[in-house]
Amino acid sequence: MRSKNISEVKKKIVVVDFGSQVTKLIARRIRELKIYCEVVNLKDFDKINDFSQIKGIILSGGPSTVTKKSYPKIRSDIFKKSIPILGICYGLQLITKFFGGKIKKTKKKREFGEATLIEKSNSVLFKNCYNQKRSKVWMSHQDAVFKLPKNFINIASTNNSKFTAIQHKTKKIYGIQFHPEVTHTEKGKEILNNFVSKICKIKKNWLLSLEKNRIIEDLKDKIKNKKVICALSGGVDSSVVAVLINNAIKKNL
């Protein structure tokens, strides 16, 4: 129930959803940093023409593999823009593939669980995250980068993945194989904060309380004096919708 007119004029981070089970966690972590963030599916992202208010793009993880002939791709024009980009898991592999690097299946069928991250280069993405050069991160992947793309450098490794984190030499394009959005990754939220605040340079512009008030006013404007029927399952989503509509139109619900 969001007004597109309002969201389009707000500076934001956009998360492109490639099907990861934890994609929405990325947006949640960024909103916890008081920065406005939207999750957009691939088809809707392809339709975006105006990027003026998009200050950063995050490519989520997902179940697909770039090693097949057909796989979900990201529109190529975003790499020609000056908008910072962070690829997470599958997002890293998309970036690597696009710029000419090589992706292969890992020796293990799938790497899932805790891994020790070893920093290889001082990167703003990891700034002030770790007192030591080693830290715990959470992996969930079956493909890995085996050859860096041209003009990229390696900024972190694990025992099972040489190129766990990479960045472009001149552009603000980053990729990480692990998941900073989950609590299992040490300083994961700080990594996301470095991306949105230090790299994207977006200022805090979102509060949950203000968002609630905005949605209620938006509902009032759209519904006016009409009657509304709300189907309530008892789950979180429908319950929140029911409360918001009730706050907006009272007896007309």
Protein language model annotation of sequence segments:
Residues M1-L59, P63-K69, F79-K81, K97-L253:
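RNA-binding accessory domains that recognize and position tRNA/RNA substrates
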Residues D77-G91:
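Short alpha-beta junction capping motif
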